[in-house]
Design a protein with these regions (language model features):
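Bacterial Sec-dependent N-terminal signal peptides
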Residues: 1-24
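Central antiparallel beta-sheet cores of small beta-barrel/beta-sandwich binding domains
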Residues: 21-99, 105, 110, 115, ...
Length: 141
């Protein structure tokens, strides 16, 4: 009987510890935007994210990637203040750069807002498509 009680309690404690870890470090992990088929992989605490296929850039705070195209927008620096991070972002060619904020919202979504600099673009059907200045991202499980 004790075995049957111990297992559910252990599972509950494990889930609780995982939930607390994501709340303590909300700017670590992967978030996505299904409408534009883009995602952000980040660890703004340890700055130890490597861009797949572009390891020459070394470890970074994170990047925004595209599910359709291999181009990336690299986070070159990040400063966290409460539930908002200020990001310096450049494309993987280094030809365009911008400053943006990434905010954790109360509903556990994230808002990326381009503050100044170049417009973020993605490639669609052999043409550049500008992304909106404000994008909402959802945590990926």
């Amino acid at each position: 009987m004790k075995k049957y009680l111990f297992l559910p309690i252990l599972c509950f404690l494990s889930m609780l510890a995982t939930a607390q870890n994501t709340q303590k470090q909300p700017f670590k992990g992967v978030i996505g935007n299904a409408e534009y088929r883009i995602y952000i992989k980040m660890n703004l605490y340890e700055n130890n994210v490597t861009v797949p296929g572009q390891e020459i850039f070394g470890e970074l705070p994170g990047f925004m990637g595209d599910s359709i195209d291999s181009r990336k927008w690299l986070f070159t620096s990040a400063k966290i203040h409460k539930n908002t991070a200020q990001l310096a972002i450049t494309n993987d060619y280094g030809s365009e750069d911008l400053v943006a904020t990434l905010t954790l919202n109360k509903d556990n979504t994230y808002t990326l807002k381009q503050v100044e600099g170049s417009n973020m673009k993605i490639a669609r059907q052999r043409k550049w498509k500008k992304l909106p200045k404000t994008l909402v991202f959802f945590p990926k499980e």
